[in-house]
Regions:
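Conserved C-terminal helix/tail region of periplasmic/extracytoplasmic solute-binding proteins
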Residues: 276-278, 288-290, 295, 309-363
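Short, solvent-exposed loop/beta-turn-alpha elements that line the ligand-binding surface or hinge
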Residues: 46-58, 98-105, 128-131, 151-170, ...
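Extracytoplasmic "Venus flytrap"/periplasmic binding protein-like
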Residues: 1-57, 71, 92-99, 195, ...
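Glycine-centered hinge/linker elements that transmit conformational signals in sensory
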Residues: 113-120, 157-187
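Extracytoplasmic/periplasmic substrate-recognition and gating elements
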Residues: 70, 173, 178-180, 219-286
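Extracytoplasmic/periplasmic solute-binding protein
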Residues: 68-77, 82, 108-160, 201
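Hinge/lid segment of periplasmic solute-binding proteins
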Residues: 28-83, 226-235, 297-302
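Beta->alpha turn/N-cap motifs
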Residues: 28-31, 80, 189, 205-212, ...
Length: 363
């Protein structure tokens, strides 16, 4: 059964409470490890994580798939990196393409702000939106704010939220003060994508390879009107972007049936670890391999091959921090308050207080 993000959590939680959880599920560490694993309803997969697997699977992925005691509740298959995008046709039109490294897909914070300014002065009143109508696409607003001046969303140990740092406050204030960037409580990430595609916005903070490949209204890599879409890492002052990632893999619910747990593990080994199968499994996902040994599986696909460059920019997978569900809600509420003119330091202090209270309650 395919579950969507509208009510999938409720369906699984209802099944768990009713004693009818599925034997096998494909999801990310924020659910398999930090949620269901922490609640004790998942079977440990430590035996699948052999020394060879640990050497082959990227360390950033490995570290997200186990808890602080070293118990693995996810065996990963594929991953992607979330990024942003710009209307490159319009950027060139206003002479701002000099601020973008289109080979590495990187730019500086100063270059980003100069690009926004050039577009705004070029007649594009709505360059970008800090969307905050809900949690949809919130990885984009977190990433633009964290990257601009080197802030973080959590501490390295994933025990508390750190959005009240001076770096984050500076970034939020800068975005609020910048002409052409508007805090918009009427839209979430999906709405922003629509507005970017139809030309209302000239930048999108909610982007990934699925969006770059989308051909619903025009060819892949083009807006509805045929403008070129350039995917970009988020701007940084350091030149070292840290992108939010998505990791997908398998978890096994412990339903008290050893035979079913064993069968589920056998399935996982075949789909996600068998040298003759794993490449095809990743290709079927349309995402990217978590194993170095799989190599460049998209060499014959120009868009996918180019997007592979973003994998090198993957940052910390902090979504496994306790209190995550509360933190996500508090985040867009905080952005809404900033958008109505509340002092930034006050807004983020409220966010951190509420998010860390939830983290402490779940720790």
């Amino acid at each position: 059964e395919y579950l969507d993000y509208t009510n999938g959590d409720d369906q699984v939680n209802t099944a768990i409470e009713g004693g009818s959880a599925p034997d096998l599920i494909m999801e990310g560490p924020e659910r398999l490890v930090a949620n269901w694993g922490a609640k004790g309803v998942m079977a440990p997969l430590n035996d699948l994580w052999t020394d060879d697997a640990k050497k082959d699977i990227y360390e950033s992925v490995n570290s997200a798939c186990h808890n602080d005691k070293g118990d693995y509740y996810e065996y990963p298959l594929c991953m992607t990196a979330h990024c942003m995008a710009v209307n490159m046709t319009k950027v060139k039109e206003v002479g701002a393409d000099k601020y973008l490294d289109t080979d590495k897909h990187t730019w500086s914070t100063e270059g980003f702000l100069n690009t926004v300014d050039a577009l705004y002065k070029g007649g594009y009143e709505n360059v970008a939106a800090i969307y905050c109508g809900g949690q949809g696409g919130d990885q984009g607003t977190r990433a633009i704010i964290n990257n601009m001046y080197g802030g973080t969303f959590t501490d390295d140990a994933h025990t508390k939220y750190t959005a009240d740092s001076a770096e984050n406050i500076k970034a939020i204030q800068t975005l609020y003060d910048t002409d052409g960037i508007n805090f918009d409580a009427s839209i979430a990430g999906g709405d922003e994508i629509t507005l970017f595609r139809n030309g209302t916005l000239q930048m999108a903070f909610c982007w990934n390879i699925a969006q770059q490949l989308n051909a619903d209204n025009n060819d892949a890599g083009l807006t509805n009107d045929g403008d070129e879409i350039m995917p970009m890492a988020f701007p940084t002052a350091s030149g070292d972007p840290k992108l939010c990632g998505g990791i997908w893999g398998f978890g096994v619910f412990d339903n008290g049936d050893e035979a079913k747990v064993k069968a589920a593990k056998t399935f996982i080994e075949f789909i996600a670890a068998d040298p003759d199968q794993v490449r095809d499994s990743v290709l079927a996902s349309t995402y990217f391999p978590v194993r170095a040994s799989v190599g460049d599986i998209y060499a014959d696909n120009a868009i996918m091959s180019e997007y592979t460059k973003f994998m090198a920019y993957l940052g910390d997978y902090y979504q496994i921090t306790p209190g995550w569900a509360t933190a996500r809600t508090e985040w867009w509420n905080m952005l809404q308050r900033v958008g109505t003119g509340e002092d930034v330091a006050t807004s983020v202090a409220t966010f951190v207080q509420n998010a860390n209270a939830a983290a402490a309650a779940e720790a």
